[in-house]
A protein has these predicted regions:
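Charged interaction segments
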Residues: 22-109
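Short, extreme N-terminal segment that most often corresponds to the first beta-strand
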Residues: 1-26
Length: 109
């Protein structure tokens, strides 16, 4: 099972439109709240399910950020007990991965 959550503040134009098709490719669980929303200058992504093309989502985010964009995307792989966090800051996207046992280490770095 995967859980993917993202928030991008001040994204470049078109980010939500780039992420929405990825939700349609995803394989979710029954009752999963899978959505991409735009609100008050922020794009939010929420997914819970079996498969989500998170590498493509990271690529879409990289393609649609500006120097003013900030935020993060968390990919929680429950089967392999891993977390990957993408950091969005200063026009770049970086990431770190580790065990979910150390998830608190990923809160803020």
């Amino acid at each position: 099972m995967l859980k993917v959550y993202a928030n991008v503040i001040h994204p470049g134009k078109g980010l939500a439109d780039a992420l929405r098709p990825l939700c349609h490719e995803a394989v979710s669980t029954d009752g999963g709240d899978n959505s991409v929303t735009e609100k008050d200058g922020m794009v939010l992504l929420s997914f819970v399910g079996i498969y989500f093309p998170w590498e493509e989502a990271a690529g879409a985010i990289r393609s649609h950020i500006t120097k003013d964009s900030t935020g993060k995307m968390d990919v929680l792989d429950m089967e392999n007990w891993r977390i990957t966090r993408f950091f969005i800051k200063d026009g770049t996207v970086t990431s770190r991965s580790g065990s979910l046992n150390n998830a608190l280490d990923y809160n803020g770095f």
